[in-house]
Amino acid sequence: PKAVGGSGRFADALVDALHAQGFTIAIESNGTIAAHRGIDWVCISPKAGSEVVQRRGNELKLVWPQQGSDIAAMEGWGFDNFLIQPMDSGDSGVNESNRKAAIEFVSQNPKWRLSIQNHKLLGLP
C-alpha cells in the first residue's frame, strides 16, 4: 500500500507509535489510494468515475444519488457495512428529494443501510 506524502516506513512508525499510546486510528477516504495496513477502521466513500483501489474495509459509504455508481460491483467488495447517505446540496428542496431517494434505495436494497449526518439535521456546521 502507498503512504501519502512519504515512505511506508514513516507510516509504519507513525501507526505503531499511535497504537503504542492507545489510539485507535480511523480514516475516511475516497478509496483511490490503498489504506495503510495498520488502520483500525477504514471507511471508503467513493466518487462516481474514480478508480477505487481500496475495496475492503469496515464501511463503504455512498453519497446518494450519485449517477454512474456501479452498485452491483460495490456489493462484491469486502466491506462489513454498506451505507447510503443522502447528498446535501445546500438546497432544502433538493435535499428532501435526496433523502427520499436514499430511503427508497435502502428499502429496495437490503444489503445497504441508511446513514445520516446528524449535525446537519440539527443545523450545526
Ranges and model annotations:
Residues 2-125:
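Conserved AdoMet/S-adenosylmethionine-binding subsite of the radical SAM
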